[in-house]
From Swiss-Prot:
Homodimer. It holds the Pfam family BBP1_N. Residues 50-71, 87-123 are annotated as: Disordered. This is Spindle pole component BBP1.
Length: 362
């Protein structure tokens, strides 16, 4: 057997070149049938897996014989590198909940083979690191839960019947198949609901766009109003500043006028006092003037009386003189003219009368 492997894998010639070319183009894939033949011969046939099972026997674990129920265990296929049966895979209850392989032709985990010469050029056959892997919907997804809401109790009953099924040695039952159900109406209902939801989302989206446009218009109007209000506020602030400046100027003038008015009040009081004093003085002067006028009037009256008396005396004196002259003329009529020098020699001449007359004239 070992010589055959050497001949197939490492020997030269056309067969080795063909094998190397096939491995380089399509990858070295070992057929699972050969491994299955190795494990299916006998329980004691270990061959190249001696070291693998020695540790398990050291730990006290015994290897069980495969039976008809081993095909239902997924670990059986994983342990022996076997492909699962399509029937069992399609009959599993949770197959629709499992992840969907977007690259069914590519291996689940790419194996880096040193003999794969053209492995870098087969990127379309293998999964790349940038490929978005599909994630299965969760159990609480509304669509999945609605689709399988009628299937859950049946699934539980089937699980209970599977758990309670007796394991009879040597029996080869057929894989359990659930009753086929037609979910076309439910799919159509879900699709209609999705269509309605899509239209509702379009309406919501349209409403959101309208609200967004309305909000933009409102923001624009608010912005314009804000700018107008800001300009008005700036003008009002400028006017207020001018008003306050003028107010402070007027207040300063008011303070000055108040001080001046205070001084004016003091001066007015002084003027009033002076006016009162002046009035009193004027009254006194008027009284004095009145007294002086009265005295002057009395003096004038006395002067007039004296003048009238003097005039009367003068008239009396003149009449007296005239009488005396007539008397003298009548008494003495000389043959020759008589001078006044000779009158002093008259015996009846009174000099005191003339003296008194002269004083009255002065």
């Amino acid at each position: 057997m070992s010589s055959e492997q050497v001949d197939e894998n490492t020997s030269g010639g056309i067969h080795g070149l063909y094998r190397w070319t096939m491995d380089a183009l399509f990858g070295s894939r070992v057929s699972p049938s050969r491994k299955y033949r190795e494990f299916a011969q006998d329980d004691t046939n270990y061959k190249s897996r001696d070291e693998l099972f020695k540790g398990s026997y050291k730990d006290g674990n015994s290897r069980g014989r495969s039976n008809s129920w081993s095909g239902l265990d997924p670990n059986f296929y994983r342990r022996h590198d076997l492909l699962p049966l399509e029937e069992s895979q399609s009959s599993s209850k949770s197959s629709l909940m499992d992840p969907v392989d977007l690259h069914p032709r590519a291996p689940a985990s790419p194996v880096l083979d040193t003999t794969d010469t053209f492995g870098a050029k087969k990127g379309s056959w293998r999964r790349s690191e940038s490929t978005i892997e599909f994630k299965s919907p969760s159990a609480d997804d509304p669509v999945v839960s609605r689709l399988f809401e009628k299937r859950k109790p049946r699934h539980k009953e089937n699980v209970i019947t599977q758990r309670l099924a007796p394991q009879i040695p040597g029996k080869f039952p057929s894989p359990v198949k659930g009753p086929s159900s037609d979910y076309t109406s439910e799919y159509l209902e879900i699709l209609n609901q999705l269509d309605r939801n899509g239209r509702a989302l379009q309406e919501v989206n349209r409403g959101l766009w309208e609200r967004c446009e309305q909000r933009q218009r409102q923001e624009k109007s608010y912005r314009d109003s804000y700018r107008e209000t800001r300009a008005e506020l700036i003008n009002e602030l400028k006017q207020s500043r001018k008003l306050y400046d003028n107010y402070y100027k007027l207040y300063g003038k008011y303070q000055q006028l108040k001080a001046i008015s205070k001084e004016t009040l003091d001066l007015q009081s002084k003027v009033n006092n002076l006016e009162s004093e002046l009035v009193d003085t004027a009254i006194k002067k008027e009284k004095q003037i009145h007294d002086l006028h009265k005295q002057l009037f009395q003096a004038e009256l006395r002067a007039q009386e004296a003048e009238s008396r003097r005039q009367r005396d003068a008239i009396a004196y003149e009449s007296r003189i005239a009488d005396l002259q007539r008397q003298l003329e009548n008494r003495y009529r000389p043959s020759s003219p008589v001078s006044y020098r000779d009158q002093s020699t008259l015996s009846d001449y009174n000099a005191s009368v003339d003296t008194q007359f002269l004083k009255n004239l002065v």
